[in-house]
């Protein structure tokens, strides 16, 4: 299939038809209850996720399935890790299945909203936006036996630094990851003030673009502290990207649920059921188990129950999972990316030219 059929993925992504968007725009013309969902969707059973279309003609049953995984780190990291799983899905579901790397949370959400992604793994915070704005239905999370394992927000500093508590970081360079991230932005805004450090008052968060980039930035001295997900930090240490002893954790939050796996609400019900079956029956390869901190399978979840604490953090941080908040966060994400690119270009321009041979 070659890099998970990346060429096919580009064709499928680029070829999302206008008729699909028109169908989505006219969906759920008569909706008895919508809740927090976008106007494209309906939630008449009040389970907080989009109902399937009332008209069976609007069910989607694509010949090629396209999926993605949250870009909490460099998307290339997961290309080979997920290859055996993608191959399992092809055989189990009986459809060509393509893994497509996405570069940002907003790009992943937009791809599902427009019909270009059929299922995807979303990180904790963006799951709420994916549910409300893209019609995503979370159904699985990584875990071990009967336990879905979570992660913590951790505040990471250099081991040699003088910082012992969050309050020591007032006026310092603190990295957040992306505006829609739970542990990388929203949770610090809610939880850090309890420890004497207020975002935007005591420090101006610097958006790094990823949890791995934040950790590496602390190691290189670009940041004094970084708010990141513990599972990403642990994976970086396990694979040797960083040395754990070079860092200290000065704060650790209560547990949050980890990334969710969700399919589009308008997939044909039989296809959605088959995806659930194929996820739950898969056992991770040794490489996947190592990469995901010992997890060895996918377990059932629901957005209503398992994401309750995350929704509460979003509300308390002033970032509810609605279109207005999403547009604001997307602009911040784009601005941060543009600023970082400009800084990188300026830094490159200052480098002395290589001597001519």
Task: Name each model feature, range by range.
Residues 113-122, 135-137, 172-174, 219-228:
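Alpha-to-beta junction loops
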Residues 1-13:
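Bacterial N-terminal signal peptides that target proteins for export
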Residues 96-103, 201-210, 248-251:
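Short beta-strand-to-loop elements that line the ligand-binding cleft
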Residues 70-71, 145-154, 241-279, 286-309:
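Periplasmic-binding protein-like
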Residues 67-90, 125, 145-216, 223-225, ...:
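Bilobed "Venus flytrap"/periplasmic-binding protein-like clamshell domains
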Residues 130-142, 236-250:
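Ligand-binding "clamshell"
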Residues 100-135, 233-238:
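Pocket-flanking alpha-helical
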Residues 25-107, 291-357:
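N-terminal hydrophobic or amphipathic helices and topogenic motifs
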């Amino acid at each position: 299939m070659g890099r998970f059929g990346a060429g096919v993925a580009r064709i499928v992504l680029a070829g999302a038809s206008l008729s699909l968007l028109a169908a989505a725009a006219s969906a759920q013309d008569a909706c008895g209850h919508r809740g927090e969902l976008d106007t494209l969707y309906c939630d008449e059973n009040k389970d907080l996720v989009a109902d399937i279309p009332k008209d069976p003609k609007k069910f989607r049953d694509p010949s090629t399935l396209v999926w993605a995984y949250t870009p909490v780190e460099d998307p290339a990291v997961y290309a080979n890790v997920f290859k055996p799983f993608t191959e399992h899905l092809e055989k189990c579901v009986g459809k060509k299945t393509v893994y497509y790397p996405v570069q940002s949370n907003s790009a992943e959400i937009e791809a599902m909203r427009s019909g270009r992604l059929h299922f995807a793994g979303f990180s904790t915070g963006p799951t709420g936006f994916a549910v409300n704005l893209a019609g995503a239905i979370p159904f699985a999370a990584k875990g071990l036996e009967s336990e879905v394992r979570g992660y913590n927000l951790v505040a990471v500093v250099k081991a040699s630094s003088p910082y012992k508590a969050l309050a020591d970081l007032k006026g310092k360079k603190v990295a957040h990851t992306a505006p829609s991230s739970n542990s990388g932005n929203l949770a610090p805004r809610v939880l850090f003030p309890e420890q004497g450090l207020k975002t935007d008052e005591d420090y101006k968060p610097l958006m790094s673009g990823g949890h791995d980039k934040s950790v590496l930035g602390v190691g290189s001295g670009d940041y004094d502290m970084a708010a990141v997900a513990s599972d990403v930090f642990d994976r970086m240490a396990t694979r040797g990207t960083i040395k754990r002893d070079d860092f200290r954790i000065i704060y650790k939050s209560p547990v949050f649920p980890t990334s969710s796996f969700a399919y589009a609400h308008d997939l044909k019900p039989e296809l959605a059921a088959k995806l659930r079956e194929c996820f739950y029956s898969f056992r991770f390869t040794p490489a996947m188990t190592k990469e995901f901190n010992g997890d060895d399978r996918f377990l059932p979840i629901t957005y209503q129950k398992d994401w309750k604490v995350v929704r509460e953090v979003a509300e308390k941080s002033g970032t509810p999972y609605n279109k207005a908040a999403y547009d604001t966060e997307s602009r911040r994400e784009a601005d941060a990316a543009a600023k970082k690119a400009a800084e990188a270009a300026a830094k490159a321009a200052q480098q002395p030219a290589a001597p001519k041979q």
